[in-house]
From Swiss-Prot:
It catalyses: [(1->4)-N-acetyl-beta-D-glucosaminyl](n) + UDP-N-acetyl-alpha-D-glucosamine = [(1->4)-N-acetyl-beta-D-glucosaminyl](n+1) + UDP + H(+). PANTHER family: CHITIN SYNTHASE. Belongs to the chitin synthase family. Class VI subfamily. Moderately expressed during appressorium formation. InterPro entries: Chitin_synth, Nucleotide-diphossugar_trans. GO terms for cellular component: cell septum; plasma membrane. It holds the Pfam family Chitin_synth_2. This is Chitin synthase VI. It is found in: Cell membrane. Its main location: membrane.
Length: 636
């Protein structure tokens, strides 16, 4: 960057002429290639793919022809109105209601105001003394499973939800490969045809080979209060997804599957989940590991999918699936958000560029990414040129004005087309982004590097959160969040603290964890080529559809009622315990003991209790119990 800037001759003369000529030649051709080739890729993708919010499936989908879509929505400290708006956007999609199953997962076991308000809006009485950890609700014809899990962060919440989904649909997925899992945020508003357009590209389009593993859609920003910051974000979202991700899609795979809008084939995610959920905070060696797996978890999941895919074009961009998310309102919040994104991006970018398996499978994609990263330091070049003109250090004839005009013209032409096609005319102000965005990007990059983990010249800050024998890695991360800076943490203390706690508590697990064996930046080699095409069932593409429509409630999966002994006394250890809190277990134990005492004092005459309980407790309370449950809409 230094030798290519229009610096004063007194400084530029210090550089060797041969080095200057070579680097200027390299910069020119890098810019030329990265300007024209991706632009042509983008044009090709726009010609061959549909763009817009229009309905693509011409026939009417019903309960028998529509694949099952499981929506995972983690929630933590969200506004009730925002959360219910997100839920409404899902259940009101133009998609058969029996084929949608929403898993609303709260990251925390406490029954707080948010939880009660959400249940009330879903039609569940809020006057009950206690609530089970999992509740099934039928809301506007769509099955919604409301769950509470122990607080552990977004990925831990996703892990618990995935395990629950895996149990609910354990029998169905053994015979079918037509279940898709959609990850969205609790503040996202889905477009009405978002689900069916996703399913169309992944499963139902004519001639579809059904080998698509994952797709991401188009995320746009929305705001109640407009400002220059929200305008720049809106233009950046559109340009970054419809241009950059479209180019990546044309090169073989997108490099980021954002958690705000990503649809995965459930069978593929099921194979990769053990690797994605295996990396825990306690296993992080340093800040690089922490940023890679916990700040850039979306990129890390995409990396695993790129390795697991057996061929190119199995991880793509759906340009007809849209959703809206709230834009950041203040500059301080924007810098904090982009700093987090940058650290997650740069660490996973290193992993991607150093993985030879990706170079072999996606050569064009990795080459484009490599070239983009080599010229990242020129983000401030435009401003330096303007400064050189203002200070008369350089004249207009010495600057590549024509080259800059062509760059602006080609990008602006695309933005004009996107604005007209999507009816988002404010993105026609793209020249404003062309001028201001380089400065913002340069500031995000420099600020993120210099403040990574809030490191000072003497090391971490004195108030940096660290793990010890009494503080777990998760608790240290929560402490950093409460202090207002989630990166003010010392990951180097995670492993020693875990080892110390293991020794103290003597809790050596029998299982062998999934660990890296050769490299700290690459996933395990056993991930390579994990994914294969779906099983084709000739003549019965969606077999057992009635089983899908009338899926049993969670409480009835795998016979959650525990066994009964000879006296009809409930035996502990059933799968229902997994959904009981400590307070529920204590009440259960008291009731269990009281029942045993009553039976011991009762004379042994008349028919045995086994006759009453041989079909389970629901057999004796069929009409009364089930009518009450059905009226409330809860299964537990």
């Amino acid at each position: 960057m230094i030798v290519t800037l229009p610096l004063p001759p007194a400084i530029a003369n210090w550089w060797p002429e041969a080095v200057t000529s070579f680097l200027q030649w390299f910069a020119f051709w890098s810019f030329s290639i990265l300007l024209t080739v991706p632009w042509l890729f983008c044009i090709y993708q726009l010609v061959t793919n549909h763009l817009g919010r229009t309905k693509r499936i011409k026939r009417v989908l019903d309960d028998y022809t529509a694949p099952k879509v499981v929506v995972v929505m983690p929630c933590y400290r969200e506004e009730p109105d925002v959360l219910i708006s997100a839920i409404d956007s899902v259940v009101q999609c133009d998609y058969p209601a029996p084929c949608i199953h929403v898993f609303l997962s709260f990251d925390g076991e406490q029954v707080d105001e948010l939880y009660l308000n959400t249940l009330g809006l879903l039609g569940v009485p809020t006057t009950l003394d206690s609530y089970p950890n999992c509740i099934d609700v039928i809301y506007k014809g769509v099955r919604i499973t409301v769950s509470r899990f122990s607080h552990g962060g977004k990925r831990q919440c996703q892990k618990s939800t995935f395990e629950l989904i895996d149990r609910v649909y354990a029998d169905y997925i053994k015979q079918n490969d037509n279940i898709f899992i959609l990850f969205i945020d609790s503040d996202c508003i889905l477009d009405r045809v978002c689900l069916q357009n996703f399913v169309y590209d992944m499963e139902l389009s004519p001639g579809n080979s059904r080998k698509m593993l994952a797709m991401t859609g188009v995320i746009t920003s929305t705001t109640k209060k407009h400002s220059i910051i929200t305008l720049l974000q809106d233009m950046e979202y559109i340009h970054g997804q419809l241009f950059e991700r479209t180019v990546e899609s044309g090169c073989g795979s997108v490099t980021c599957l954002p958690g705000a809008l990503t649809m995965l084939r459930f069978s593929a995610f099921r194979r990769m989940a053990k690797y994605y959920f295996a990396d825990k905070a306690e296993e992080c060696d340093d800040l690089f590991d922490y940023a890679k797996c916990h700040l850039g978890e979306d990129r890390w999941l995409t990396h695993l999918f790129m390795i697991g895919a057996k061929q190119r074009y199995q991880i793509q961009m759906c340009t007809s699936a849209f959703c809206k998310t709230e834009a950041v309102q203040t500059y301080a919040s924007l810098v904090k958000q982009r700093r987090r994104w940058f650290l997650g991006f740069i660490t996973n970018e290193v992993c991607m560029l150093t993985d030879w398996r990706l170079w072999k499978r996606y050569p064009a994609l990795i080459l484009v990414r490599f070239m983009q990263n080599t010229i990242r330091t020129t983000a401030l070049l435009f401003f330096v040129m303007v400064l050189a003109l203002l200070t008369t250090t350089a004249s207009v004839r010495n600057l590549p004005v024509g080259f800059m005009a062509v760059s602006l013209g080609l990008n602006w032409l695309l933005m004009l087309y996107f604005g007209a096609k999507l009816k988002r005319f404010k993105i026609w102000f793209y020249p404003l982004m062309f001028v201001l965005n380089p400065l913002f990007n340069w500031y995000y990059m420099v600020y993120g590097i210099l403040t990574a983990g809030q490191r000072t010249w003497g090391g971490p800050r004195a108030d940096a959160a660290a793990a010890d024998i009494h503080t777990t890695a998760r608790e240290a991360a929560e402490q950093a969040e409460r202090q207002g800076d989630e990166l003010n943490i010392v990951p180097e203390t995670f492993k020693p603290a875990k080892e110390a706690r293991t020794i103290v508590h003597q809790n050596q697990g029998p299982g062998i964890p999934i660990v890296r064996k050769r490299s700290v930046v690459r996933p395990p080699d056993v991930v390579d080529g994990q994914f294969s095409g779906p099983r084709n069932i000739k003549g019965v593409p969606y077999a057992s559809r009635r089983h899908l429509q009338h899926a049993e409630p969670i409480s009835e999966q795998a016979n959650p009622w525990p066994a009964y002994d000879a006296d009809g006394i409930l035996a502990r250890g059933g799968e229902g315990d997994a959904y009981m809190s400590d307070e529920d277990k204590r009440k259960y134990a008291i009731a269990h003991q009281a029942q045993r005492l009553r039976l011991e004092q009762r004379p042994r005459t008349g028919p045995s209790l086994n006759a009453r309980w041989q079909n389970g407790p629901q057999a004796s309370e069929t009409s009364q119990g089930r009518s009450q449950v059905d009226d409330v809409g809860i299964a537990f």
